[in-house]
């Protein structure tokens, strides 16, 4: 099936914060843009300005001053299908510049995605975009494939939601999947708050983007939080400076590791949930006792919010403290983990053995949207 780009499958990973899209067989997504749709706040007064009724992605981001921005995906789950359709349209026609009716499309979904949502995705692909074939895969499973494994537990943490997903021989174990509504956006908000305490004011959505950039460039996870705090009080070794777009330079020290510490101590932002280490442990404990050893030895990190320096060592330390003392613990943090869901999709869609797994248009026409539950699991 894979003979050149004419019928190369498309892979589209729709995240809360970013859409990652491209062609199966590539080693990285061609298009990465924000999952946002913006509509003008006011009607245009300039005649012939060619105002659009909606802007998507980077264009919406850059014109955010005159737009009302909406995120059609919240906590990993689509909640606004009209806007989602606009995002897919933009992905195919503007970003990848392909005709979706000529390519099979692999979409990704959050773990525990409601059944009605999978059906809706399937329906839109076949009825709105007329794709010849499609498939829906669980994000965490794709990340595990990308790491070259079929068994393990994936901690997938993006912008809107984190999940721990135990996978055995390629199948996610739904009863043991745990969701934590704590992710990148919450960390950005927390950093905005601790910078405000220091007298810097970041409030607008535009300023939030600056803080997100600061978080991504300067934050790291301390191996021992209390000790790191002590060090930061007496020494300037953790201080780093950051230049704002207007040329002002700000210096941040302890904020660098205070921000992502929330992942391990959600109580810092008033959440009662256990941290990512405990959630991972709880997920493993919900699995059959015979497979736990395989899970402890294959803890795979995935998603943009796992990109902080020091996260692998800290995760390893925390889980070792929770697990039985004789247990061998291995935390895998692949360098490309920001895109590992997409990469896993690219690998899967280009396997020769996968070609009979696609839902073909003819099958959809015969069975309707519920076909997705029979063919994608």
UniProtKB/Swiss-Prot annotation:
GO terms for cellular component: chloroplast envelope; chloroplast stroma; cytoskeleton; cytosol; mitochondrion. Its EC number is 3.6.4.-. Keywords: Acetylation, ATP-binding, Cytoplasm, Cytoskeleton, Hydrolase, Nucleotide-binding. Gene3D superfamilies: 3.30.420.40, Actin, Chain A, domain 4. It is found in: Cytoplasm, Cytoskeleton. Pfam families: Actin. It catalyses: ATP + H2O = ADP + phosphate + H(+). The keyword Amino-acid biosynthesis does not apply. It is an enzyme of class 3 (hydrolase). It comes from the Eukaryota. The keyword Acetylation applies. GO terms for molecular function: ATP binding; hydrolase activity; structural constituent of cytoskeleton. Displays particular expression in the root cap and pericycle tissues associated with lateral root development. Little or no reproductive-gene expression is detected in vegetative organs, such as stems, leaves, sepals and petals. Its main location: cytoplasm. SUPFAM superfamilies: Actin-like ATPase domain. InterPro entries: Actin (IPR004000), Actin/actin-like_CS (IPR020902), Actin_CS (IPR004001), ATPase_NBD (IPR043129). PANTHER family: ACTIN (PTHR11937). Belongs to the actin family. There are 8 actin genes in A.thaliana. Actins are highly conserved proteins that are involved in various types of cell motility and are ubiquitously expressed in all eukaryotic cells. Essential component of cell cytoskeleton; plays an important role in cytoplasmic streaming, cell shape determination, cell division, organelle movement and extension growth. This is considered as one of the reproductive actins. This is Actin-12. It comes from Arabidopsis thaliana. The gene is ACT12.
């Amino acid at each position: 099936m894979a003979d050149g780009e004419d019928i190369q499958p498309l892979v589209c990973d729709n995240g809360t914060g970013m859409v990652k899209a491209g062609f199966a067989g590539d080693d990285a997504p061609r298009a990465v843009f924000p999952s946002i749709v913006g509509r003008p706040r006011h009607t245009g007064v300039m005649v012939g300005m060619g105002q659009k009724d909606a802007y998507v992605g980077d264009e919406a981001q850059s014109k955010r001053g005159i737009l009302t921005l909406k995120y059609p995906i919240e906590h990993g789950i689509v909640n606004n299908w009209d806007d989602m359709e606009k995002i897919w349209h933009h992905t195919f026609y503007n970003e990848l510049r392909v005709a979706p009716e000529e390519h099979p499309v692999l979409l990704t979904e959050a773990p525990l995605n409601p059944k009605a949502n999978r059906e809706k995705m399937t329906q839109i692909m076949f009825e709105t975009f007329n794709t010849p074939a499609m498939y829906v895969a669980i994000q965490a499973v794709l990340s595990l494939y990308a790491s070259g494994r079929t068994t393990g537990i994936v901690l997938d943490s993006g912008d809107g939601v984190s999940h721990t997903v135990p996978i055995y021989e390629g199948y996610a174990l739904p009863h043991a999947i745990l969701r934590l509504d704590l992710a990148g956006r919450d960390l950005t908000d927390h950093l905005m708050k601790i910078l405000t305490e220091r007298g810097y004011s970041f409030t607008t959505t535009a300023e939030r983007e600056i803080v997100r950039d600061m978080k991504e460039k300067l934050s790291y996870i301390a191996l021992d939080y209390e000790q790191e705090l002590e060090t930061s009080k007496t020494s300037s070794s953790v201080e780093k400076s950051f230049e704002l777009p207007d040329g002002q330079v700000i210096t941040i020290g302890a904020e660098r590791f205070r921000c992502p510490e929330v992942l391990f101590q959600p109580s810092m932002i008033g959440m009662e949930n256990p941290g990512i280490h405990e959630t991972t442990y709880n997920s493993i404990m919900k699995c059959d006792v015979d497979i736990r050893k395989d899970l402890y030895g294959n803890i795979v990190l995935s998603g943009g919010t796992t990109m902080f320096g020091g996260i692998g060592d800290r995760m390893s330390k925390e889980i070792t403290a929770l697990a039985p003392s004789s247990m061998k613990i291995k935390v895998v943090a692949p360098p490309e983990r920001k895109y590992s869901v997409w990469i896993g999709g690219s690998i899967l869609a280009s396997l020769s053995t996968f070609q009979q797994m696609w839902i073909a248009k003819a099958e959809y026409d015969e069975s309707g949207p519920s076909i997705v539950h029979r063919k994608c699991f």
